[in-house]
C-alpha cells in the first residue's frame, strides 16, 4: 500500500531515518516510506491512502482536495480528542464534518476509540506511537536523577509531576517546552534542560533513573514510550496506551496523586520493585513500540 501523510509542516518529501526531529508523526512516515506532504500543494504522485493531520490552529482542511491524489483519506488525531472544542463555533462544526467525511479515523489510544465512535465515526483505528532510534543506544549506565515530562501548566501537569518527583530524593530535571512559564526558572530544585532536537532529547534521556509525567492531556504519550526505550520506570496517569503498556505498575488514575507519591517512594526504597518496573518498561517497548512491532500491527488492519 502506497501511503502519504499530509500536515502543516509537510513539504512533499520523505524523511531520512536519522532525521534529527523525528517525532512520532515523522517516525510513522519513515516506517512506511511515506512522504510528508503539504495540505495546500498536491504531490505529483498518486497514493492508495492519504493520512491527514489536521493543524491545531487551522482546522479548515479540505479533504476533497486531498482526494485528488489519494484513493482513500483518513484523519489522524492531533492532540487530545477534545481539543477542537476550544475552536470558534464554525470551526468546531467544520472539524466535526471533516471527521465524518473521512474514510476512517486514526486515534492515539484505545481510550479515544469510543469518543470518535460516539461522534459518529464508524471506522476508528488506533495508530500506535512510534520512535525510530536510528543509531541511538538504550541506556547502559544508570544515573540517579529524576526527570519530569512537562512544564507548570495544566496541559502538561507539571506541578503534579513535581510533587511526586520530590519523593525520589534525587535531583529533578525538566524539559523546556513551548508552554514553559518564565517564572519556572526561579524554582530552585528543578534543573531545566535547553530546547533540544528529538535526537538530542532521546540521547539526553538515557542518563535519568526515574520518569514522572502526570499529564492529564492524553495524546501520543511519547514521554512514557521514550522512557521505556531506555528501561526507565515512569509514573503516569491512566488513559495513555504507552503508559499502560510499558509501565503498568506505575500507572495511576487521573488525579490520584496519593498513589503516585507512594509509587515514587517505592521506586526509591525498594530496588526489587524498581528492577521489576524497569523490566516491564523494557518488555512493553519490545512488545508494542519497536518499528517491527509497529509495522506488524499496521499490516493487521488491512488483512482482517
Please report, for each region that a protein language model flagged, where it lies by residue.
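Acidic donor-binding loop of glycosyltransferase active sites
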Residues: 206-219, 232
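A charged, aromatic-enriched C-terminal amphipathic alpha-helix characteristic of glycosyltransferases
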Residues: 20, 269-303
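Short alpha-helical segment that forms part of, or immediately flanks, the ligand-binding pocket
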Residues: 202, 224-230, 243
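Conserved acidic donor-binding segment of nucleotide-sugar-dependent glycosyltransferases
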Residues: 248-257, 266-271
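Donor nucleotide-sugar binding/catalytic pocket of nucleotide-sugar-dependent glycosyltransferases
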Residues: 103-115, 121-136
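Membrane-proximal helix-turn-helix segments that form the acceptor-binding/catalytic region
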Residues: 87-105
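Conserved catalytic-core segment of nucleotide-activated headgroup transferases in glycan assembly
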Residues: 16-21, 133-135, 139-186, 192-198
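N-terminal pre-catalytic "stem/leader" segment of glycosyltransferase-like enzymes
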Residues: 1-65, 115, 249-253, 296, ...
Amino acid at each position: 500500500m502506497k501511503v502519504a501523510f499530509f500536515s502543516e509542516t509537510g513539504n512533499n518529501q520523505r524523511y531520512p531515518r536519522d532525521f534529527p526531529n523525528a517525532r512520532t508523526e515523522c517516525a510513522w512516515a519513515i516506517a512506511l516510506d511515506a512522504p510528508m506532504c503539504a495540505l495546500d500543494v498536491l504531490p505529483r504522485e498518486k497514493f492508495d491512502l492519504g493520512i491527514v493531520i489536521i493543524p491545531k490552529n487551522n482546522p479548515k482542511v479540505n479533504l476533497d482536495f486531498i482526494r485528488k491524489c489519494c484513493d482513500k483519506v483518513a484523519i489522524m488525531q492531533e492532540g487530545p480528542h477534545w481539543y477542537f472544542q476550544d475552536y470558534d463555533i464554525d470551526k468546531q462544526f467544520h472539524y466535526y464534518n471533516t471527521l465524518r467525511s473521512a474514510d476512517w479515523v486514526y486515534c492515539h489510544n484505545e481510550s479515544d476509540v469510543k469518543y470518535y465512535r460516539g461522534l459518529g465515526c464508524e471506522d476508528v483505528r488506533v495508530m500506535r506511537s512510534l520512535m525510530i532510534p536510528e543509531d541511538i543506544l538504550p541506556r547502559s549506565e544508570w544515573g540517579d536523577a529524576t526527570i519530569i515530562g512537562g512544564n507548570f501548566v495544566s496541559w502538561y501537569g507539571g506541578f503534579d509531576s513535581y510533587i511526586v518527583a520530590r519523593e525520589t530524593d534525587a535531583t529533578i530535571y525538566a524539559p523546556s517546552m513551548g508552554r514553559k512559564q518564565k517564572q519556572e526558572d526561579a524554582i530552585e530544585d528543578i534543573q531545566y534542560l535547553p530546547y533540544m532536537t528529538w535526537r538530542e532529547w532521546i540521547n539526553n534521556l538515557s542518563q535519568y533513573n526515574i520518569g514522572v509525567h502526570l499529564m492529564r492531556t492524553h495524546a501520543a504519550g511519547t514521554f512514557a514510550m521514550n522512557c521505556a526505550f531506555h528501561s526507565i520506570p515512569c509514573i503516569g496517569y491512566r488513559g495513555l496506551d504507552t503508559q499502560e503498556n510499558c509501565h503498568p505498575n506505575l500507572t495511576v488514575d487521573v488525579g490520584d496523586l496519593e498513589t503516585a507519591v507512594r509509587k515514587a517512594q517505592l521506586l526509591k526504597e525498594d530496588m526489587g520493585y524498581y528492577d521489576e518496573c524497569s523490566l516491564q518498561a523494557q518488555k512493553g517497548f519490545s512488545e508494542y513500540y519497536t518499528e517491527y512491532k509497529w509495522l506488524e500491527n499496521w499490516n493487521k488492519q488491512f488483512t482482517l
